[in-house]
Amino acid sequence: MISNKILLSCIFILCLFFPCCSFYEQTENSKSDYTDKEIEYFTEIALGSEYGSNVQVIRRWDSDIKIKINGNPNEKDLQTLNQVISDINEIIGDKINLSLVDSNQNIDINFVPLSDFSICNAAPGNYGYFNCKWINNVIYECDICIATDDVLLQEERSHMIREELTQSLGLMNDSLEYRDSIFYEEWTYTQKYLEIDKKMIEILYSDKIKPGMVKQEVESVLRK
């Protein structure tokens, strides 16, 4: 009699336990691929741009990026540029590919003194600058200027190469959220991507994100 009661108790407990497990698994599986912090940071840096248009929508490329080098880069500049291209291709190379070309470019990166920054229609006070053009929020052309003036340390130039090329992907805003992020608003010497920087690039070129999306649409698709 006692053994029967024990058996019934065990069956009852198992019946309670397994539905709970099933519910837990469904809840876990229904979670978004991205955290709230990642989504919040993405909407901060990917909607609109620091300069120019104030329209808060997604802009990005839908074709491979071909980069032509102009001006007078030094050896370290070229090493940095190649490393940044490699880093970006590692993140989104299955979506779009970045490469260096001698002609038929859609990005010009200009290593020039500040006195020649008019090439990029640069806002005053910048030692690195990007200026992109788009149609229907699809980017098709960019000019990047990197200052070669002696006042700059190589570490600063290398930082700006990474920052300006990354932002020309469509992540056009700065932020004060993460000091070591390539998108940090104040002057830094960041030489590599944080994991959250990589995530921002990944999200922008994910299948969920489309040119012209507004904040509500972005948040909705990323939370699914």
Predicted stretch roles:
Residues N126-E156, M172-K224:
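Metalloprotease/metallohydrolase-associated module, dominated by Zn2+-dependent proteases
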Residues I65, I69, N97-S118, E185-E186:
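Acidic helix-start/capping segments at beta-turn-to-alpha-helix junctions
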Residues E75-S99:
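Zn2+-dependent metallopeptidase catalytic core
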Residues S22-I69, P73-E75:
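Disordered inhibitory propeptide/activation segment of secreted metzincin zinc metalloprotease zymogens
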Residues H159-L171:
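Active-site recognition of the HExxH zinc-binding catalytic motif
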Residues F18-C20:
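C-terminal motif of bacterial Sec signal peptides marking the signal peptidase cleavage site
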Residues M1-C10:
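Bacterial N-terminal signal peptides that target proteins for export
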Residues Q56-R60, K76-D77, L114-Y140:
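Catalytic zinc-binding patch centered on the HExxH motif and its immediate surroundings
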